[in-house]
Amino acid sequence: MRVADFSFDLPDELIARYPTAQRNASRLLTLSGENSELADKKFTDLFNLINPGDLMVFNNTRVIPARLFGQKSTGGKLEILVERMLDDKRILAHVRSSKSPKVDTLIDLDGGYQMKMLARHDALFELELQSDKTILEVLEDVGHMPLPPYIDRPDEDTDKERYQTVYNQTPGAVAAPTAGLHFDDAMLADLKAKGVNIAFVTLHVGAGTFQPVRVDNVLEHKMHSEWANVSQEVVDLIAQTKAAGNRVVAVGTTSVRSLESAARASGDSPLEAFSGDTDIFIYPGFQFKVVDAMVTNFHLPESTLIMLLSAFAGYEAVMKAYQHAITQKYRFFSYGDAMFVTKKAP
């Protein structure tokens, strides 16, 4: 397939630049993978679409304030976007500057901190903090929330709360697992009271999630790598859910990628726990082994995420659903509305 097959025209006014007043006040478009039927609903209607005994799997990564501003010793300004924390002092990062910093040069950050340029790894720079504090402490002190480029505004204080799920736990993401932004504590409590099981995986979403696909042929795309963890407890819950004839519902494409990465690593054996880097690329033709349904936001044209959704529910059904969403003026991308999608028949 061609990357251009996943293109669509989106009016600029449908890009959500701020979240709804309440987390669960967004709209929900349902898409049945079995028959391609669409239905316009409210996000709170999701409660009626999840059955007792179903297992909902959330990504509990915490978004770090990963954007830093500073200047080189020459006085030139630069912007750092953390891709990954290597340890308490070192990061891999994207650096935006008129000229790339050279090895061993020092970078002065806002707040009086300094970083040293250690090495370059293709498009990423390895930087070391010159401070008694940890990277995480410095980010919490002077870092900015890494809003996606299409939101096209400076981050605000409210983004520290709203560009973060209510169940976040493990710091490391530089982009939010956005399907989870719609859930508040009350809705999670209601789902549990209904008999829905809740589980958590971790995938630290990297800045690569915003990188465009730069090839014409889908098969030639090289996926960026991210760290994920699927515990034995989650594996056991999945086995129990499947054995009882119930569904595994992934909240967000990052949860999907975590679970299917574990399945890929397990090979032909029963599902096993997984912890490590994953570069899984899911596109039409992929055989899903774990996930039966998913909650997801509306994704960018020609992105790997709309390819994943097309693999899950069928290419034609997804493109038709997106045209419907545009016609009905759904809000798109990270702060936008959501979909509930069931897997297409084999």
From Swiss-Prot:
One of its GO terms (molecular function) is S-adenosylmethionine:tRNA ribosyltransferase-isomerase activity. Pathway: tRNA modification; tRNA-queuosine biosynthesis. InterPro entries: QueA, QueA_dom1, QueA_dom2, QueA_sf. It holds the Pfam family Queuosine_synth. One of its GO terms (biological process) is queuosine biosynthetic process. One of its GO terms (cellular component) is cytoplasm. It is found in: Cytoplasm. Keywords: Cytoplasm, Queuosine biosynthesis, S-adenosyl-L-methionine, Transferase. Its EC number is 2.4.99.17. It catalyses: 7-aminomethyl-7-carbaguanosine(34) in tRNA + S-adenosyl-L-methionine = epoxyqueuosine(34) in tRNA + adenine + L-methionine + 2 H(+). It is an enzyme of class 2 (transferase). It comes from the Bacteria. Belongs to the QueA family. Monomer. Transfers and isomerizes the ribose moiety from AdoMet to the 7-aminomethyl group of 7-deazaguanine (preQ1-tRNA) to give epoxyqueuosine (oQ-tRNA). PANTHER family: S-ADENOSYLMETHIONINE:TRNA RIBOSYLTRANSFERASE-ISOMERASE. This is S-adenosylmethionine:tRNA ribosyltransferase-isomerase. It comes from Shewanella frigidimarina (strain NCIMB 400). The lineage of its organism: Bacteria, Pseudomonadati, Pseudomonadota, Gammaproteobacteria, Alteromonadales.
